[in-house]
From Swiss-Prot:
Its main location: membrane. It is an enzyme of class 2 (transferase). The gene is dgkA. Keywords: ATP-binding, Cell inner membrane, Cell membrane, Kinase, Lipid biosynthesis, Lipid metabolism, Magnesium, Membrane, Metal-binding, Nucleotide-binding, Phospholipid biosynthesis, Phospholipid metabolism, Transferase, Transmembrane, Transmembrane helix. Its cofactor is Mg(2+). This is Diacylglycerol kinase. Catalyzes the ATP-dependent phosphorylation of sn-l,2-diacylglycerol (DAG) to phosphatidic acid. Involved in the recycling of diacylglycerol produced as a by-product during membrane-derived oligosaccharide (MDO) biosynthesis. Its EC number is 2.7.1.107. GO terms for molecular function: ATP binding; ATP-dependent diacylglycerol kinase activity; lipid kinase activity; metal ion binding. PROSITE patterns: DAGK_PROKAR (PS01069). It comes from Pseudomonas aeruginosa (strain ATCC 15692 / DSM 22644 / CIP 104116 / JCM 14847 / LMG 12228 / 1C / PRS 101 / PAO1).
Length: 123
């Protein structure tokens, strides 16, 4: 296997390349993953609401952080699904487990949003 042409880059060029890859990842997720688009919409609604609520700065930061956490988990879940599908589209118990575990992680992240927001708003 030949070495990656991107290894060894440093400084501004590395940062610019990494930013480009990140933006490409966001775009791929937004275009190809309905769940990611739904979470973006949820964040577009909840984050401004967090600024409108009469809560402490710490509570507001926590409310926003858990919303962003769900986006992070969905990006990782989508990456797992893409990798599994790239390896083989054949049904296999390990492939199912990998995809189900990614889905479970997203379920936990959404539960964290619900519990956090409910605790702050009802607390």
């Amino acid at each position: 296997m030949s070495p990656s042409p991107f290894k060894g880059q440093t400084g501004l060029k590395r940062i610019l390349n990494a930013t480009g890859y990140s933006l490409a990842g966001f775009l791929a997720a937004f275009r190809g993953e309905a769940a990611f688009r739904q979470l973006v919409l949820l964040n577009v609604v909840l984050i401004p609401v967090a600024f409108l609520l009469d809560v402490s700065r710490g509570e507001r930061a926590l409310m926003i952080a858990v919303c962003l956490l769900a986006l992070i988990v969905e990006l990782l879940n989508s990456a797992i699904e893409a990798t599994v599908d790239r390896v083989s589209l054949e049904r296999h118990p390990l492939s199912k487990n990998a995809k189900d575990m990614g889905s479970a992680a997203q379920f936990v992240a959404l539960t964290v949003i619900t519990v956090t927001w409910a605790t702050i708003l009802l607390g």
